[in-house]
């Protein structure tokens, strides 16, 4: 049996896998434990690459367990904020591994953490899973920031209760809006190292000015929300832009970078079922 967690976001999917104990024992120490693969949804072959990734894992499992590759079974949990991408992926997985696969979407009802908001079923499952995974790993109270397409800043009480939070546009969404809403401003590539560096002073060209403005807006919003939520809390930052945001925050925020909390939460969920 292979446990698979798939975090379907708006710009990428993260696939985390955990093989059986016997398979783990047969692997080199450096490759043991959960394996994570991130695939961009902009890649037209993203579904194919996801299936190929699982097939490669099946070959390793089959070799360790002396069985046919086709008989390797998968237990899959999907957390999605993007149904338009998640549904065709699940259909393709069922077709590729129909003999031995179980796929289930994760909902707020799967989260053991109490959810103290007006409409729990409307909260993004990524926010809930990230908050629960952070609570399992760090001292509460917690402020959990997920820096992706959007940036969410959520509060978990000392008792481990999800209290809600704030949502704002992410780095790429902000710069895309600047480029789309003006004639002269370019679209930035936040994946490049240069874009991810926080300028040390006023921007001396257009790109530097955009970088400074967007990074300062997100980092400044997080700092402001820390004050609004009040009290001392552990700050945990996850998501694709976690590293960039942590670098932009002042040292006194003492932010902890955990880039793959949602994927880790999916494995936690399966292990505790």
Curated annotation (Swiss-Prot):
Residues involved in K(+) binding: 146
Assembly: Homodimer.
Biological process annotations from GO: coenzyme A biosynthetic process
Residues annotated for ATP binding in this entry: 7-14, 149
Pathway info: Cofactor biosynthesis; coenzyme A biosynthesis; CoA from (R)-pantothenate: step 1/5
Keyword Membrane carried by entry: no
Protein name: Type III pantothenate kinase
Obligatory cofactor(s): NH4(+); K(+)
Cofactor note: A monovalent cation. Ammonium or potassium.
GO cellular component: cytoplasm
Swiss-Prot/TrEMBL catalytic activity: (R)-pantothenate + ATP = (R)-4'-phosphopantothenate + ADP + H(+)
Residues forming the catalytic site: 126 (proton acceptor)
Molecular function terms from GO: ATP binding; metal ion binding; pantothenate kinase activity
Annotated EC: 2.7.1.33
UniProt: substrate binding residues: 119, 124-127, 206
Source organism (scientific name): Rhodopirellula baltica (strain DSM 10527 / NCIMB 13988 / SH1)
Free-text function comment from the UniProt entry: Catalyzes the phosphorylation of pantothenate (Pan), the first step in CoA biosynthesis.
Family under the similarity heading: Belongs to the type III pantothenate kinase family.
Subcellular location: Cytoplasm
Name of encoding gene: coaX
SUPFAM superfamilies to which the protein is assigned, alphabetical: Actin-like ATPase domain (SSF53067)
Keywords for this protein: ATP-binding, Coenzyme A biosynthesis, Cytoplasm, Kinase, Metal-binding, Nucleotide-binding, Potassium, Transferase
Pfam families xrefs: Pan_kinase
